[in-house]
Design a protein with these regions (language model features):
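Short amphipathic alpha-helical surface micro-motifs
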Residues: 27-29, 61-64, 101-103, 118-124
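Acidic, proline/glycine-rich low-complexity IDRs
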Residues: 96, 103-171
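N-terminal leader/targeting segments
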Residues: 1-81
């Protein structure tokens, strides 16, 4: 299943993300679509392009503590996107990509009879008040237990969205 999803995603990601974004009602900047198609799909985890590469393993270890064997994780770091996005791009663009990818995977899995995935958690990794480009992380998949269920409100198209509200993914 992993290899099939990896192949299919790498082939179709840009177009599907754009299509999903149009369903949500707002376009994804081309820079973000290009960026997402260069991301890594590693051992069942979907990981954004990363510098330094060592942080891939660190992220996988952290995710493995929380998530089931089949899960999807994506990290967007606005530092890495800085050169891709023009001055008119809004912070909401990052949030929009999360929903587009989540929407795509939910539809893809549902079409193939796989249990409906749920958005598990969302965080903004801002540790200092003067951080200019915080990282935004979302994960969805099959939670190990009820305590692992976290939801993000689909109305919270804001960089300051917080864990604890609800999102529904409709097929």
């Amino acid at each position: 299943l992993h290899s099939k999803i990896e192949h299919f995603f790498n082939e179709k990601a840009g177009r599907l993300i754009q299509d999903s974004a149009r369903r949500i009602g707002s376009p994804v900047p081309k820079g973000l679509s290009d960026w997402i198609t260069q991301a890594d799909f590693y051992n069942g985890y979907f990981l954004g392009p990363r510098d330094p590469r060592d942080s891939l393993m660190e992220q996988i270890v952290e995710a493995a503590d929380r998530l089931d064997d089949f899960s999807v994780e994506m990290t967007l770091n606005k530092i890495h996107l800085e050169d891709e996005l023009n001055a008119e791009s809004q912070p909401d663009d990052c949030i929009l990509v999360y929903f587009a990818v989540c929407d795509y995977f939910a539809r893809y899995l549902l079409e193939r009879g796989v249990t409906k995935p749920l958005l598990l958690w969302y965080s903004t990794d801002v540790h200092e008040p003067d951080v200019e480009f915080p990282s935004h992380t979302m994960s969805f998949g099959f939670p190990r237990s009820e305590k692992d269920y976290y939801y993000l409100d689909v109305e919270s198209f804001r960089a300051d969205a917080v864990v604890g509200t609800q999102i529904s993914i409709n097929p």
